[in-house]
């Protein structure tokens, strides 16, 4: 007689397969593992709006739950989860663009330029820089360096070729380096 593994000992992919077969406990375990980090992802992508981030996090899991039967063995759970999250952010920012003109969005505001940052708090400086670069580039940076997704996973999530993901990450890093040097010189 085989004894099933404790849920906490199973991989995300194993849990998602169980959830696809109707196990609410397996889905709850996935939620417990990923909700906090996913909400942090949304907070960073939604200008520190914690309430909106919580709504987006819950919406992501609701969509994941509704589509759980479509999950196939061999797929990366995290890539699927962040595909949903990425698309929610992309749609949100697309809706925001109807309010703000593209050229205004791509340029940092005077307030962003004049913000005085303590050079000892690199994290805060980085977050400010990320707010001033175009959203698609900031999103790629966040997926790779903050959420620790691989280039192939990001390519799958964003529906971009791997080479494009790499070149945009390289360009983003150069922009970040240049802007952080400006903060250093203040």
Regions found by a protein language model. Name each.
Residues 8-9, 91, 96-123, 150:
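Internal acidic/polar
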Residues 20-21, 46-48, 58-76, 95-96:
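Sigma70-family region 2
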Residues 2-6, 20-29, 39-59, 157, ...:
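Short, charged helix-capping/linker segments at alpha-helix termini
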Residues 128-139, 147-164:
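Helix-turn-helix DNA-binding module
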Residues 33-36, 45-46, 142-149:
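Short helix-capping/turn signature of helix-turn-helix
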Residues 66-73, 83-103, 119, 171, ...:
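Arg/Lys-rich amphipathic alpha helix in sigma70-family domain 2
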Residues 94, 138, 173-186:
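Short, Lys/Arg-enriched C-terminal cap helix and immediately downstream tail that follows
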Residues 34, 168-175:
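Residues within the DNA-recognition helix of helix-turn-helix
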């Amino acid at each position: 007689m085989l004894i099933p593994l404790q849920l906490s000992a199973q991989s995300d992919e194993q849990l998602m397969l169980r959830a696809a077969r109707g196990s609410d406990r397996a889905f709850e375990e996935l939620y417990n593992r990923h909700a906090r980090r996913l909400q942090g992802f949304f907070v960073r992508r939604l200008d520190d709006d914690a309430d909106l981030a919580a709504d987006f996090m819950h919406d992501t899991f609701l969509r994941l739950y509704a589509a759980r039967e479509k999950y196939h063995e061999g797929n990366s759970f995290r890539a699927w989860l962040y595909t949903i999250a990425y698309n929610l952010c992309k749609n949100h920012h697309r809706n925001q663009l109807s309010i703000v003109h593209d050229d205004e969005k791509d340029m940092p505001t005077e307030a962003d330029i004049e913000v005085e940052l303590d050079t000892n708090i690199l994290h805060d400086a980085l977050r400010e820089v990320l707010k001033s670069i175009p959203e698609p580039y900031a999103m790629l940076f966040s997926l790779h360096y903050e959420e620790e997704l691989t280039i192939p996973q990001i390519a799958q999530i964003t529906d971009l070729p791997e080479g494009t993901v790499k070149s945009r990450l390289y360009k983003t890093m150069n922009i970040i380096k240049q802007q952080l040097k400006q903060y250093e010189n203040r």
